[in-house]
Amino acid sequence: METGNVVNAQPELSGIIDRSKSYMYEQLWKLCAGPLCDIPKLGEKVYYFPQGNIELVEASTREELNELQPICDLPSKLQCRVIAIHLKVENNSDETYAKITLMPDTTQVVIPTQNENQFRPLVNSFTKVLTASDISANGVFSVPKKHAIECLPPLDMSQPLPAQELLAIDLHGNQWSFRHSYRGTPQRHLLTTGWNEFTTSKKLVKGDVIVFVRGETGELRVGIRRARHQQGNIPSSIVSIDCMRHGVIASAKHAFDNQCMFIVVYKPRSSQFIVSYDKFLDAVNNKFNVGSRFTMRFEGDDLSERRYFGTIIGVSNFSPHWKCSDWRSLEVQWDEFASFLRPNKVSPWEIEHLMPALNVPRSSFLKNKRLREVNEFGSSSSHLLPPILTQGQEIGQLSVASPMNISLLYRETTEDAMNPSRLLMSYPVQPMPKRNYNNQMVTQIEENITTKAGTNFRLFGVSLATPPVIKDPIEQIGSDISKLTEGKKFGQSQTLRSPTKIQSKQFSSTRTCTKVQMQGVTIGRAVDLSVLNGYDQLILELEKLFDLKGQLQTRNQWKIIFTGSDEDEMLVGDDPWPEFCNMVKRIYIQKRR
């Protein structure tokens, strides 16, 4: 590691949010803060919720909420203006936070505004979730080919071994040196010398995210975002100075009474307690009631945005100290399981209404992109397809389940009834409008059938002379649930199978297998990952396919790698099994050198 500044040919552009920092610093800070970070604008009118600030202090100091909150005459929300924003990073953990200066809204003070028309240079960036091999003792970081081409300085490919030195600055202003080379079999982009020092100094672990940003002038920035389980607290020095010296309530009360500025610390992963005035009004006007369906955004492990669905089951005050407060006033119930803890009470501005046509959510963990028939319910696949025009759908109009009927599936028929959101993983379909040319085509077909009696006409495999009877999937589900209820009354044991299991049984034979190539073997093999439960079974299956008998388990002679859509090589076993199944395109077995 080196400390210093990179010399640019042009003066560094100041940030738009934090003018004391550079534009590149600001872009890196936002990427490290995550996709859900919502920083207000300079001069913007906002609502400040003391309850949210106290909640952040509670999480940081592990104090009880009630012990921190005295009883005083302070509104549940304060209307303020944003005076200044300073984007910061914690020295030890590299966690991002912001110091936001607020002032109770007044027209007597000149408020600085954010320059939205400022020139914004082109910035390329990429993020990657670190695997076990990325932080291993060999000190090598594999850069996906697409990201290396777009975000790293170009290599001189005319050289026998293309390589270059990279200088990257982190959020602290420290400069790091990495050796970037293009080598291996097959060749790939690697960061070698300097990478091990970086991972050791930053105490990186598997699951952390590395962030690279490159500006138009070639300046390179590097940052990290800790995995969710690695998230620590705001440093005690910051909390004690900015929040705890006079107390959150005391400082807010003093500013409110005397119309003076006060500073709050905002952490990107905390709930938003500084809310835009317009955003707050939109949320309140949405009229969230008991029974309303909603969706809420969360951050995935790879810095991606994920949505989860739920239902509002109650409206009440989160704390007895503030009556009629909107902070976490909605009690919710989630539809699906998540690998992390989600709140059971949320604020109106954190969620979005689900439109009636979207009341049947697509499961966030349902990754299958190929839609399949579910004949278990006695319906054609057209009932379960999303609102996309399919072949043959223009001929006539199919009967589909209305959103009103589908929404009834969320009510449990009996105590032991399954959650129908899991029973029927389908998409709501709006009826296709009838068109004039549909009637003309059907009339033409009917005339042909009349003139040529005895001939069985088929259109897309469907007999036009004797149209099939299409059963309503909703009625069939109701019948199955009724049978289940009756069976339990008489002590019988009946089980409704979920469509996921039905699909896997019906279509396992048609799934695309993954090709496996072994060094020294001309003809490759194919393995079906859908029937395997993990890496141990995969290794056993590969040993059977190539008659290796235990040689792959020790990995002394062979190594197993795979390539994804970007053709980059990665070791098998570094990623969680479900992620591996989604990424893998081809598997290779190579001899160790």
From Swiss-Prot:
Its main location: nucleus. GO terms for biological process: auxin-activated signaling pathway; regulation of DNA-templated transcription. One of its GO terms (molecular function) is DNA binding. SUPFAM superfamilies: CAD & PB1 domains, DNA-binding pseudobarrel domain. SMART domains: B3. The keyword DNA-binding applies. Residues 511-592 form the PB1 domain. Keywords: Auxin signaling pathway, DNA-binding, Nucleus, Transcription, Transcription regulation. InterPro entries: ARF_dom, ARF_plant, AUX/IAA_dom, B3_DNA-bd, DNA-bd_pseudobarrel_sf, PB1-like. PROSITE patterns: B3 (PS50863), PB1 (PS51745). The keyword Membrane does not apply. It comes from the Eukaryota. Pfam families: ARF_AD, AUX_IAA, B3. Residues 126-228 bind DNA. GO terms for cellular component: nucleus. It is found in: Nucleus. Interactions between auxin response factors (ARFs) and Aux/IAA proteins occur through their C-terminal dimerization domains III and IV. Belongs to the ARF family. Homodimers and heterodimers. Auxin response factors (ARFs) are transcriptional factors that bind specifically to the DNA sequence 5'-TGTCTC-3' found in the auxin-responsive promoter elements (AuxREs). Could act as transcriptional activator or repressor. Formation of heterodimers with Aux/IAA proteins may alter their ability to modulate early auxin response genes expression. This is Putative auxin response factor 15.
